[in-house]
């Protein structure tokens, strides 16, 4: 399916040294720049965070200090990224809550005023949550493999309780959790 774009779209993801926008730094930025004519430009960049990558981040991402030691810093990359991203909208997964604020903070630290208020921000996670039902019936179908209405009368406390119990058991079984 071709996207119906009026401006280029940057679909991107970041890996970072942690979740704190002030203290943590980007260690990898990957993006696909999709033009209105459908052409795509891909880039994957390791970034030197100028600080050690925490062990738990190495475990999660597989990115080590050795991977980024000779990589450019964000401050070095910022002018070129700002130019590439100028006039583009942005899309990501959970990007409005994490990636955009982290990227904005890195641009500020680099002394570049990249104004995200003038672009469209598309968060695929937000769309997913709006499009996919997130109620007890949806959870029952996912974890129990059946339609809730086939087994229970909805909005009856006793039956909703029973369905919730079965969902919880299905979650524990699926996630292999032993204790709560």
What are these regions (language model features)?
Residues 156-167:
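Acidic, divalent-metal-coordinating active-site segment for phosphoryl/phosphodiester hydrolysis
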Residues 126-129, 141, 166-169:
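Generic alpha-helical structural context detector
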Residues 178-180:
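Conserved small/polar residues in nucleotide/adenosyl-binding loops
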Residues 121-135:
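Short alpha-helix plus adjacent loop in nuclease-associated cores
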